[in-house]
């Protein structure tokens, strides 16, 4: 597979791009967080069990793994935000997403478990985000020990808004390539 095609399959909406703080971006990214569960649910709508076990690209996760991964990732994100809002530059806990994707809950449980979790989680997350002040977006930080990097909550908001759209695009691009209506 050519490097360009592989990159497009891995990053169908491109890689995350940082943006300076703006009210317009804040509104956009918060809407992305709010509506991600519905968008992901629509992306997997009417897929059968065999389709859920197709990887979105060669060597990539299956659709089932993607859905459960988004739930795992966004649970971590929600906690990272709350810790970042209540502690001074806390060190966040990394996790091995590749190993998490191999756990039995990901392999065996139906995706509606994670979709339901995402609907509830994103309601709580969005409610929390509505009350983050502009000063907090720019000044509250967390430290990521694997990347050895301090990250503003503003950066994380954009990253996780992108992350959700990124995985919805994985599902939608596979559906399109496979001709699944």
Where is each model-derived feature located?
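Small-residue-biased structural context
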Residues: 2-6, 23-25, 32, 42, ...
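A generic "alpha-helical surface" signal
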Residues: 27, 31-34, 64, 68, ...
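Alpha-helix N-cap/loop-to-helix boundary motif
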Residues: 25, 32, 58, 69-73, ...
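Short, contiguous alpha-helical
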Residues: 1-17, 52-98, 126-127, 138-181
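Acidic/histidine-rich alpha-helical segments that form the ligand environment
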Residues: 31-43, 101-138
């Amino acid at each position: 597979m050519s490097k360009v095609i592989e990159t497009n399959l891995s990053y169908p909406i491109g890689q995350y791009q940082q943006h300076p703080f703006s009210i317009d971006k804040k509104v956009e990214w918060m809407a992305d967080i709010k509506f991600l569960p519905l968008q992901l649910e629509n992306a997997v709508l009417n897929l059968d069990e065999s389709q859920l076990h197709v990887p979105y690209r060669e060597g990539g996760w299956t659709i089932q793994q993607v859905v459960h991964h988004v739930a795992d990732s966004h649970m971590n994100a929600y906690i990272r935000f709350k810790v970042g809002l209540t502690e001074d530059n806390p060190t966040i806990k990394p996790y091995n997403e590749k190993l998490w994707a191999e756990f039995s809950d990901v392999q065996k449980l139906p995706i509606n478990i994670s979709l339901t979790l995402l609907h509830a989680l994103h309601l709580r997350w969005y409610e929390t985000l509505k009350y983050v002040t502009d000063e907090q977006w720019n000044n509250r930080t967390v430290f990521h020990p694997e990347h050895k990097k301090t990250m503003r909550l503003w950066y994380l908001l954009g990253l996780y808004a992108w992350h959700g759209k990124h995985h919805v695009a994985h599902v939608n691009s596979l559906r399109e390539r496979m001709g699944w209506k």
